[in-house]
A protein has these predicted regions:
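Long recognition/docking surfaces used for binding and targeting
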Residues: 1-14
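SAM-dependent methyltransferase catalytic-core segment centered on the flexible catalytic loop
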Residues: 103, 107-209, 218
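A short acidic (Asp/Glu
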Residues: 42, 67-72, 87-90, 110, ...
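C-terminal target-recognition/interaction regions appended to catalytic cores
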Residues: 322, 326-565
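Class I S-adenosyl-L-methionine
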Residues: 217-218, 230-271
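Conserved S-adenosyl-L-methionine
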Residues: 25, 31-111
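Flexible, glycine-/basic-rich loop-and-beta segments that form/coincide
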Residues: 251-317
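Short secondary-structure boundary/capping segments
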Residues: 15, 76, 93-94, 153-156, ...
Length: 565
């Protein structure tokens, strides 16, 4: 049967012949020409202009040869999983040896065995290059996805199919306790290259690869990093926004980095150039140190409180007022801090405060001993907006000896009370699993006596009795012991004003929206905002303006105190 001819009208159309859904299910995204060219420039700066003649080059996930198709090489090997890609790109890099190869599953024979069915798939020239320790560059743009939790991309790609990461290399990485890094496809590709370097004792090899930056910064990549640093030395790197790749979000960054065989000395800090496309050219717009928390205290560790042995059952919430489970929490808790992961990108949707346990876990109990730290870290995480440059920056334990630390901490208490992700609430007699529960709001900031006075003034018997039979809440008592900045005090003042001015509407609101339990004396601001929005929305607008002043004052201190670098 004759081979079917595939017509290609322009290089930009090559990738469109590969089914888009299929590519995304595997986490594959192909390299734009402008970034492929820049990668060649970086390699030339490191290895010299003649590197294409002096080095063997292997792109082991070549796709339709975007990385190499516009250049000539003395000895180039291109392999990919899909035969269709080889057919489409058959007329490109005709000097290359192109072959189908499942890089994450098929064995590569070592020095002890050069025969066997699997070994036959590797071209003889490439086998000889490995055996003879020839200078070699592994030049790749591997798939980025992970099916478990797309922390790299914040689901910008959608999830990849669950089976995509179930490879031989995945099993090898899991056996070495690499954790979540083992499910990540680009980490699997790089680890396979590390294995090849070790197996063949390669001393003059380089890895040049595109990837997200999480492999350098993320806590879940600790073991993977150690393996990489024991075998390769960082030479150079750039970071750019992912949206320069087709149909990808602009909220996170992609990197291209170059590594040489050797041992990395500084394992915590890596100087990258920040680049962007300006006037159809790639320009350096800044520099940035990518860092990890491997040898220092992370923010998530800093805020943890030693768990007590005394646990109590409590209802778990999925938002401020909806119960979705039951669990155990320390008996001295005053709330719960949802603190998922430890980087900027996860602060958007995975950081919050609750008056009881949260059904999604990934957080810490809040008690008197870690209350200030909780508020400080919560504020540091919510104050910084995620972007493609900072998305994978990790939070650190702050400099507590800094002159502004206590001021920031005091401000953060107020900031935390009124942030949109602060889901503190007061709930009474909620039923779950045939039990009735009361949830007290220890984050309430006003005095019991003032609420009693308001209840008497507006004939709200339920609220009066609820307060009268209770005690002062923790945060109110805490606020009596600290001094607040003018900006923080202004927020407290207008929040108090909202409570006082909207109190007369509580009975009416409760009839329409009983689920908010607005007559509880220690209602959280989440509940009070709902009341205010319905009856006095102009007050909320004024509140947001005052709250923004506090936020703007605090934001630079996140970096001054070294929560972030």
């Amino acid at each position: 049967m004759a081979t079917k001819k595939i017509k290609i009208h322009s290089p930009e159309n090559y990738d469109r012949f590969i089914d888009d859904k299929e590519r995304r299910n595997k986490g594959q995204f192909y390299t734009p020409k402008i970034f492929a060219d820049y990668a060649h420039k970086m390699i030339s700066e490191a290895l010299g202009n003649n590197w294409k003649d002096e080095y063997v080059v292997w792109d082991n996930c070549c796709g339709t040869k975007n990385l190499t198709r516009d250049y000539k090489f003395k000895e180039l090997y291109c392999s990919t999983l899909e035969n269709e890609e080889l057919e489409i790109s058959a007329h490109l890099n005709t000097e290359a040896v192109s072959f189908q190869f499942d890089f994450l599953n098929e064995p590569i024979a070592g020095r002890e065995s050069l025969t066997g069915v699997y070994d036959d798939k590797l071209p003889k020239g490439l086998k000889d290059a490995l055996l003879e320790n020839k200078p070699i560059v592994f030049f790749i743009n591997p798939p980025y996805g992970t099916p478990c939790c797309n922390d790299e991309t914040n689901k910008s790609f959608g999830g990849i199919t669950a089976g995509a990461c179930n490879t031989v290399i995945n099993s090898e990485m899991k056996s070495k306790k690499f954790g979540r890094a083992s499910t990540n496809l680009y980490a699997q590709f790089v680890y396979r290259l590390i294995m090849i370097k070790q197996k063949y004792n390669l001393s003059n090899c380089y890895i040049a690869f595109f990837s997200p930056t999480l492999f350098l910064t993320g806590q879940s990549f600790y073991s993977f990093r150690n393996e990489l640093f024991n075998n390769f030395v960082f030479i150079d790197g750039i970071q750019f926004k992912a949206s320069h790749f087709a149909d990808v979000s602009s909220t996170w960054g992609i990197s291209f980095s170059l590594w040489k065989a050797g041992k990395q000395i500084d394992k915590n800090n890596f100087l990258y150039k920040i680049v962007d496309v300006l006037d159809n050219d790639i320009k350096i717009i800044d520099k940035k140190v990518l860092y990890n928390t491997d040898n220092c205290i992370s923010g998530s560790y800093w805020v943890k409180q030693t768990n007590t042995k005394n646990k109590i059952e409590v209802p778990l919430l999925r938002n401020a007022i909806t119960v979705s489970g039951e669990g155990k929490i320390d008996n001295n808790f005053i709330g719960y801090f949802l603190n998922n992961s430890n980087n900027v990108s996860r602060s958007i949707s995975f950081v919050g405060l609750f008056s009881t346990g949260f059904s999604g876990a990934h957080g810490v109990n809040v008690c008197k001993e870690n209350f200030e730290k909780t508020c400080a870290l919560f504020s540091a995480r919510k104050l910084i907006e995620n972007n493609w440059i900072n998305s994978k920056d990790e939070y650190l334990a702050p400099n507590e000896s800094h002159l502004k630390f206590q001021e920031f901490t005091n401000d953060s208490i107020v900031y935390s009370l009124f942030n949109g992700a602060s889901n503190q609430s007061s709930l009474r007699q909620i039923k779950y699993h045939d039990k009735l529960w009361d949830i007290k709001n220890e984050f309430f900031w006003m005095s019991k006596s003032e609420i009693e006075s308001l209840a008497l003034k507006y004939n709200n018997d339920y609220c009066f009795n609820d307060a009268h039979n209770s005690r002062e809440r923790f945060v109110y008592e805490k606020l009596q012991t600290i001094s607040l900045s003018p900006e923080a005090q202004a927020v407290i003042d207008i929040a108090n004003d909202i409570v006082r001015k909207t109190f007369k509407y509580r009975e009416s609101f409760n009839k329409e929206h009983p689920e908010y339990q607005i007559n509880n004396w220690d209602c959280g601001f989440y509940q009070i905002k709902k009341l205010c929005k319905e009856y006095m929305p102009e007050l909320l607008k004024e509140f947001k303006e005052v709250y923004k002043v506090l936020s703007d004052k605090m934001r630079p201190m996140v970096y001054e105190l070294v929560f972030l670098k």
